[in-house]
């Protein structure tokens, strides 16, 4: 018997999302116009809370859908205007270009990145050294590339290796289903569990590595570029400005990596079983023998393009997104990727998030039009200049750990710049606040998958169920890093940021907007 029209519509609305989630969104959409008529300020804050809710529930439904519906309604009922949304999008065009072209560009360098991480995994026998190598490699790559892409590459390596061993353990060859353990021989099961623990720890080290490296440069995370643009900083300026906080945090983060591996705390410390290493080594040896001269040349070309990417970013030869576009053109032209559909696959990772970011800017337009953050900013600005840095860092950190750090960073840097333009703070103080905002959005956000897009990507990937990486386990394994990164970042903002920045300015290393 066919279902009713009403039931069919309910099933179509947000698809497989839970009924309670659908109902919650409908309630939001119904009550918002009435609350806006009664009190626009409260309605604005309610909209922000609802939007943060959709971000926190990203595993139930991709936030673009519910967040987009809320944003459309906000424009219709007059909380902001379509013209203001367009202005916000236009002002952040560089960020949209970064997401569209840089992420797609790195997609065509995946072979090189896969080669690097495969060599690391099979060449280094010490688990502590291997974990450190993965963390450092992810940090370095994320400083110049998109963190999502770096995590995607490490996931590809892990899924590939897991599949190879799972096939051997189940003795089912190409018909093997990696999610089905029913055919695993009993003596392989213990080894498989150990291998899962090994992969879980490597993935978490790599994920945190992307946060450690991503905070250091203006292209490491999307919000970095927004903050750099507001402050008028180029690549080198941004790196130097952040270094009083980010360099000590990087060192302490790497020490944490070594400590949790050594002490086997928080689910870390599992080593690669020798049986698994033998299987993977045999597979790699076969793959290397099959590698043709054409394949080797592709790796060399990708490495040269990588050098061009780093050089172009460091010297600011063009806008970041345009450098990414040049990577797409060079990588496809010189490695023989000519099919439109093959090129189109490169954009599948970045475009949903680019669309979501455009929705972010709609909510930012509401925040500006309704002056939602004015009371918070006034409260912070009443404090001493020294205390302002700590408060901005903590407010950003708290929100970023439960919401998306791009959203949070965009809001706070806009408010800080408005305060400077209104004469409430000096240019020098604004530049210090920009560092506090950037580090506040990037470092504490490792606490949950909601804050870091790379963590959320890992949690929703095909790898997570294979290695038994749940939301709770990810939060638990991230906990030591959350504590260390947040506290060291706070101490550096409190004690080293202002004096080191002053020293670099006097030494002539830094320029200002004035």
UniProtKB/Swiss-Prot annotation:
Gene Ontology CC entries for this record: plasma membrane
Residue spans crossing the bilayer: 23-43, 63-83, 97-117, 120-140, 144-164, 202-222, 238-258, 303-323, 357-377, 391-411, 447-467, 475-495
Family matches, as InterPro entries: Na+/H+_antiporter_NhaB
Recorded GO MF terms: sodium:proton antiporter activity
Alphabetically ordered keywords of this record: Antiport, Cell inner membrane, Cell membrane, Ion transport, Membrane, Sodium, Sodium transport, Transmembrane, Transmembrane helix, Transport
Annotated localization: Cell inner membrane
Membrane-topology descriptor: Multi-pass membrane protein
Biological role: Na(+)/H(+) antiporter that extrudes sodium in exchange for external protons.
Protein family per UniProt: Belongs to the NhaB Na(+)/H(+) (TC 2.A.34) antiporter family.
This protein's name: Na(+)/H(+) antiporter NhaB
Organism: Salmonella schwarzengrund (strain CVM19633)
């Amino acid at each position: 018997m066919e279902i009713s029209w009403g039931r069919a519509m309910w099933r179509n609305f947000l698809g497989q999302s839970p009924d309670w989630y659908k109902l919650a969104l409908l309630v939001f959409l119904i009550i918002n116009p009435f609350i806006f008529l009664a009190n626009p300020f409260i309605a604005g804050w309610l909209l922000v809370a609802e939007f943060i809710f959709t971000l926190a529930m990203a595993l139930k439904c991709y936030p673009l859908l519910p967040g987009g519906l809320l944003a459309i309604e906000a424009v219709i009922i007059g909380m902001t205007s379509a013209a203001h949304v367009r202005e916000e999008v236009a002002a952040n065009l560089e960020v949209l270009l970064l997401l569209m072209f840089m992420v797609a560009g790195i997609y065509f360098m995946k072979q090189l990145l896969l080669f690097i991480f495969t060599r690391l995994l099979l060449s280094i026998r010490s688990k502590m050294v291997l974990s450190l190598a993965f963390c450092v490699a992810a940090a370095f790559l994320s400083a110049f590339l998109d963190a999502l892409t770096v995590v995607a590459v490490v996931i590809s390596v892990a899924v590939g290796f897991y599949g190879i061993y799972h096939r051997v353990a189940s003795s089912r060859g190409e018909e093997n289903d990696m999610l089905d353990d029913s055919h695993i021989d009993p003596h392989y099961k213990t080894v498989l569990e150990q291998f899962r623990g090994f992969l879980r720890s490597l993935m978490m080290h790599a994920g945190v590595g992307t946060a450690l490296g991503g905070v250091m440069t203006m292209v490491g995370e999307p919000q970095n570029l927004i903050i750099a643009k507001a402050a008028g900083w180029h690549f080198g300026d941004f790196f130097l400005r952040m270094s009083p906080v980010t360099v000590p945090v990087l060192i302490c983060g790497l020490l944490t990596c070594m400590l949790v591996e050594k002490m086997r705390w928080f689910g870390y410390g599992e080593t690669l079983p020798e049986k698994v290493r033998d299987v993977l080594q045999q597979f790699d040896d076969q793959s290397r023998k099959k590698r043709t001269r054409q394949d080797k040349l592709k790796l060399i070309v990708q490495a040269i393009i990588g050098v061009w990417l780093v050089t172009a970013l460091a010297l600011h030869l063009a806008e970041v997104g345009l450098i990414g576009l040049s990577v797409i053109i060079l990588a496809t032209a010189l490695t023989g990727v000519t099919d439109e559909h093959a090129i189109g696959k490169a954009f599948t990772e970045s475009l949903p998030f680019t669309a979501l970011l455009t929705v972010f800017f709609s909510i930012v337009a509401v925040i500006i039009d309704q002056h939602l953050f004015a009371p918070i900013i006034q409260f912070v600005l009443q404090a001493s200049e020294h205390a302002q840095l700590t408060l901005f860092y903590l407010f950003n950190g708290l929100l970023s750990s439960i919401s998306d750090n791009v959203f949070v960073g965009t809001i706070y840097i806009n408010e800080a710049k408005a305060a400077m333009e209104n004469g409430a703070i000096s240019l020098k103080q604004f530049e210090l606040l920009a560092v506090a905002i950037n580090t506040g959005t990037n470092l504490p956000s490792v606490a949950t998958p909601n804050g870091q897009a790379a963590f959320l990507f890992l949690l929703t990937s095909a790898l997570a169920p294979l290695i038994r990486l749940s939301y709770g386990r990810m939060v638990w394994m991230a906990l030591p890093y959350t504590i260390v990164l947040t506290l060291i970042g706070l101490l550096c903002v409190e004690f080293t940021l202002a004096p080191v920045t002053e020293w670099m300015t006097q030494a002539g290393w830094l320029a200002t907007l004035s």
